[in-house]
Structures are given as C-alpha cells and as structure tokens.
C-alpha cells in the first residue's frame, strides 16, 4: 500500500483529520506511526461505536501501530455504571469482545488499561502540567468530551481533572495519532495546543462522525443549540435505548427498530438509516446491499456503493421501507458473529441484564 492509498484509507468516512498535511508528512518520513483510541466502558455497546471501530480496523490495515485505552478510571470519574470500578472493568472486557467479533485484529492491537497509567507517578506529573497550562474556563468547555455540559463541572472536582487526564493519556503514550468521535475534538485540540509548551508531539487528530439516533434530527427541539449540544441531543445514545440499536439486539428487534426509524422519502440530512449504510454497512470495501422487492415495484436490485444508494434514494427510486428492510438484513449479518460471542459467555449476558435494569444516562 503506497502513501496515497494509506491516506485514502485512513481519511475515508471521517469528519475531519487535523491535519492531512501532517499525516502525509509523517507517512513520507516512513516512520512507524503510533495511534490510539480511548473509550469509557460505560455500558452497552451500540452500533454507533462501530463507526470508530471500523476506522480502527482501517488504521491497523494502513500499518499504524494502534492501541486501545480502556478508560476505566475516566468512566468512574464520569459516574458511569454507578462509579463501580469492578463493573466498569467487566464492561471493558465486554467491549473488547465486541471488537473482536467485529473483526478487529486483536493480535495487532495493544490493549492498555487506565490502571497501567495511573499507577505511574510520571503520568500524574503530566496531568498537573497539562492543568497548569490550561485555563479553568477552557477546562470547563472541554467537558463535552464526557457527554456533559460545562456547568456540570460543579458536580464534583474530579470532573475538572478529566480533560487533563485525556490529554495526558496521549502524551504519556507518545502518540502520533488520536482517534475519536467528533465529541472528542476539544480534548484533541487541547492536546495539540499544549504540546509545544510541554515539548511533546503535536498529535494528529482523526474524528469520526457520531451516528444520529433512530429518531433522526428532525423530531427534536434543537433550535438555538450550539453544535456540540446539538450533536449530543440527536446522537444515538445507550441512555436513550429507544434511539439505539445495540449489538446484542435480536434480529427481530433490529428489524423492528429500523422499521420505526426516521427515514422520510428522499431526505438525506440526519437520516439514521442512510448513516448506518454509509458508515457501517459500506464501511467495509467491496460490500453489496441487496434490495428485495416485488417485480411490480421494480424487482430486486444490488447496490454496490453508498453513493449509488444515496442517489437513487434522493431520486425517489427506492422506497424507505425497502431500504429499511434491506438495511436490517445486512446489519444483522454484521451483528450475528458479535451476538454469538457475547451470548456464549455468561458474565457478559449477566452484565447486559444488570445494565438494562439500571440505565440512567
């Protein structure tokens, strides 16, 4: 794979790469790039997470030395799973099991736990230095990386440490690339801004889109919201299970949820069914989506790219229900091996049951 092919693979289906010029320069230097994705083991794994998981696969395929940070302490600070660290750790193992079922090559992925970082005094030295070089106002604004608003900094002081910890995660691992959803942008930009002051690498930030919830963006009262708050309002969320498809949902439930999802005829903007196709189904190269329909409605068709799918949908040549049913079939094909892995292990079945009974946000 040459440099142009690597850049195309790394940048496809991303919202932004900061910056592509820096990425190209690093690749041209022929250095072995180190990247990471960090995630909070905060509960049930929904299909929105498969977007960054697919990009993780792309980066590994492009030859980037990737690690994944199981951010257990971060989840505790963020009050996930009641702050129960043991339950959070189990949720981390569950998420790694999902990634393996999704086809992530775990032999090429280094797994790092927050415990590996926080036991090192040099890590906390970095946290203090990052905090020292960041204003209180900016630290509060960065709380959106936790799925919180700036005013929630008043909940407890540990919330203010969180952004400095995330920046330190990057510096401590001496990374070239930080992968995350667009909701992680403020942490990554903070890392880039502070890097020079601390004589650290200016990390390349790769941001994947957030999958809109099944309700779409058109049914929500979002007028006047800032972009971060708007995205937080419409995104698929495990705390709003009616808006989400979970990886353990039965095939019948997946189909039912998609049949009831927002997908107006010819409308692309904030359309969850189209987004699932763009970022998850067509996230892999060489995929075909088969639309099954009666001959009186045009007969079966095979769609070989997302661009083709979007075009015929806009032109009104594809009925929303036909698209929903085809999407359900293809999505279930993707979820099937994941469901089998999770359902075969009682500790994860019990975890899912426990979380479903106590979803708070």
UniProtKB/Swiss-Prot annotation:
Catalytic activity, EC: 6.1.1.1
GO CC annotations on file: cytoplasm
Gene3D superfamilies reported in the protein's UniProt record: HUPs, Tyrosyl-Transfer RNA Synthetase
CDD domains in the cross-refs: TyrRS_core (cd00805)
GO biological process: tyrosyl-tRNA aminoacylation
TM helices/strands, residue ranges: none
Localization per Swiss-Prot or TrEMBL: Cytoplasm
Keywords, sorted A to Z: Aminoacyl-tRNA synthetase, ATP-binding, Cytoplasm, Ligase, Nucleotide-binding, Protein biosynthesis
GO molecular function: ATP binding; tyrosine-tRNA ligase activity
Catalytic activity line of the entry: tRNA(Tyr) + L-tyrosine + ATP = L-tyrosyl-tRNA(Tyr) + AMP + diphosphate + H(+)
Self-association state and partner proteins as the record states: Homodimer.
Name of the featured protein: Tyrosine--tRNA ligase
Lineage of source species: Archaea, Thermoproteota, Thermoprotei, Sulfolobales, Sulfolobaceae
Gene that this sequence comes from: tyrS
């Amino acid at each position: 794979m040459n440099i142009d092919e690597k850049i195309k693979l790394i940048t496809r289906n991303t919202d932004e790469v900061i910056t592509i010029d820096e990425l190209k320069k690093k690749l041209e230097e022929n250095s072995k790039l180190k990247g990471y994705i960090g995630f909070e083991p905060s509960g049930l794994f929904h299909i929105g997470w498969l977007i960054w998981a697919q990009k993780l696969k792309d980066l590994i395929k492009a030859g980037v030395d990737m690690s994944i940070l199981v951010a257990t302490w971060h989840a505790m600070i963020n009050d996930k799973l009641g702050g129960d660290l043991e339950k959070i750790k189990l949720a981390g193992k569950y998420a790694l099991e999902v990634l393996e079922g999704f086809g992530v090559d775990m032999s090429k992925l280094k797994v790092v736990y927050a415990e590996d970082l926080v036991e090192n005094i040099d890590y906390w030295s970095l946290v203090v230095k990052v905090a020292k070089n960041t204003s209180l106002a900016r630290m509060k604004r960065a709380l959106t990386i936790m799925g919180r608003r700036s005013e929630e900094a008043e909940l407890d002081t540990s919330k203010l440490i969180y952004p400095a910890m995330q920046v330190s995660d990057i510096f401590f691992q001496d990374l070239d690339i930080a992968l995350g959803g667009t909701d992680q942008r403020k942490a990554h930009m903070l890392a880039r801004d502070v890097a020079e002051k601390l004589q650290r690498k200016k990390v390349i930030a790769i941001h994947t889109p957030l999958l809109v919830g099944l309700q779409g963006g058109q049914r929500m009262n979002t007028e006047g919201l800032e972009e971060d708050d708007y995205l937080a309002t419409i995104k698929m969320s495990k705390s709003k299970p009616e808006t989400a498809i979970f990886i353990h949902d039965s095939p019948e439930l997946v189909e039912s949820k998609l049949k009831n999802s927002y997908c107006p005829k010819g409308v692309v903007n904030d359309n969850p069914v189209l987004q699932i196709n763009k970022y998850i189904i067509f996230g892999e190269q060489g995929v075909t989506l088969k639309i099954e329909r009666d001959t009186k409605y045009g007969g079966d068709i095979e769609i070989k790219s997302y661009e083709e799918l979007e075009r015929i949908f806009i032109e009104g040549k594809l009925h929303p229900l036909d698209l929903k049913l085809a999407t359900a079939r293809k999505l279930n094909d993707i979820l099937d091996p994941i469901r089998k892995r999770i359902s075969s292990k009682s500790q994860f079945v019990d975890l899912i049951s426990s979380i479903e009974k106590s979803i708070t946000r």
